[in-house]
Amino acid sequence: LSLPQPDPGVLRKAQRGDERAFSIIVRAYQVPVFNYVLRLVGERSLAEDLTQEVFLRVYQGLPRFSLRSKFTTWLFQVTKNRVLDELRAVERRPRAVVDLDDVPALEVLDAPFERLEAIDAVWRAVEALNVDLKSALLLRDVVGLSYTEIADALEITLATVKWRIYKAREDVQLALAREGITFYAASEPDAVVTPAV
């Protein structure tokens, strides 16, 4: 599940301004960056804009990037910093009222209602986490970075990463338990996430 590093030759070409090489990098990492940003900000159009801005910053900073560092770690440092800037700016802006009729419904076909309900509850619980816990959890469980890569990307200690992920998972499980949703061990036959009856 770990995110692979880009080809060093492609990375060097991109550092020298080769747009084709940079587009290869963007294509390789655009989806994981977007998914991470979307889960942090919760709004698709904002996540799309922020993802574009992240890659603009990466393009601008690439000539100064040290090839001795892991690219994915640096990429998610840039991403984290841009998202935190946006979240701080949002806190200072007045909030608009959202009409629930304007929110599109989630449509997933061929999935049992209970499973969709459980998945939705998981994402609600993740969204309720504070940004520090949410960032660490998403980088691990959605993006697939190692604990060490997360520590580097978030510029925190390895012990702090482990605690944040542990605490985030614990908080999500408690939130789900409050909604009556239980998890069965993956080793059990036909293990699924279901609402408790």
Placement of each model-derived feature along the sequence:
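Sigma70-family region 2
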Residues: Q15-R16, R39-R44, E53-K70, A89-E91
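Short, charged helix-capping/linker segments at alpha-helix termini
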Residues: L3, K13-I24, F34-E53, L158
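Amphipathic alpha-helical segment used for protein-protein interaction
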Residues: Q5, R12, R16-E19, E91, ...
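Arg/Lys-rich amphipathic alpha helix in sigma70-family domain 2
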Residues: Q60-L67, Q77-V97, R115, K167, ...
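DNA-recognition helix of helix-turn-helix
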Residues: K80, L84, R88, L133, ...
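Structural recognition of an alpha-helix C-terminal capping motif at a helix-to-coil junction
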Residues: N35, D49-L56, S69-N81
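C-terminal edge and immediately downstream basic/flexible tail or linker adjoining helix-turn-helix-like DNA-binding
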Residues: L1-L3, K13, R95, R124, ...
